[in-house]
Swiss-Prot record:
GO cellular component: blood microparticle; haptoglobin-hemoglobin complex; hemoglobin complex
UniProt GO BP: hydrogen peroxide catabolic process
A Pfam family reported for this protein in Swiss-Prot or TrEMBL: Globin
Subunit structure: Heterotetramer of two alpha chains and two beta chains.
Function as written in the Swiss-Prot or TrEMBL entry: Involved in oxygen transport from the lung to the various peripheral tissues.
Species the sequence originates in: Ara ararauna (Blue-and-yellow macaw)
Keyword flag Iron: yes
CDD domains, sorted: Hb-beta-like
Name used for this protein in its record: Hemoglobin subunit beta
Length: 146
């Protein structure tokens, strides 16, 4: 993947302002609420019976932070995303059996969360760069699937 200097600047500039805990919790909670079939991968998280339960679930919050912290590794390694996510791809494919389509869904939700958090600072150019990034990350995570 080729990144322009402008794309790199837009991505790193915005990412530097992201509250990983809050945005991660919101993104994962939205995934579980908007696409309820994804909840089956999180059975060990306890009560996911309603949007209120999901939004208040500390395990959802903690895992959301973990997911976005990992996503931050993509931002730090824009030129080597495939290798950055090789182990996570293997884990999600071989052990967790996550449908790779869920990576794309989470990426789209992350864009919505960032747009909501950053308002007018989330310009169309910024959205384009981040949409490209979430596609590349989703592709890297799906790499180990046959």
């Amino acid at each position: 993947v080729h990144w322009t200097a402008e794309e790199k600047q837009l991505i790193t500039g915005l990412w530097g302002k992201v509250n990983v805990a809050d945005c991660g919790a919101e993104a994962l909670a939205r995934l579980l609420i908007v696409y309820p079939w994804t909840q089956r991968f999180f059975a060990s998280f306890g009560n996911l019976s309603s949007p209120t339960a999901i939004l208040g679930n500390p395990m959802v919050r903690a895992h959301g932070k973990k997911v976005l912290t990992s996503f931050g590794e993509a931002v730090k390694n824009l030129d080597n995303i495939k290798n950055t996510f090789a182990q996570l791809s293997e884990l999600h494919c071989d052990k967790l059996h996550v449908d790779p389509e869920n990576f794309r869904l989470l990426g789209d939700i992350l864009i919505i969360v960032l747009a909501a958090h950053f308002g007018k600072d989330f310009t169309p150019e910024c959205q384009a760069a981040l949409q490209k990034l979430v596609r590349v990350v989703a592709h890297a995570l799906a790499r180990k699937y046959h």
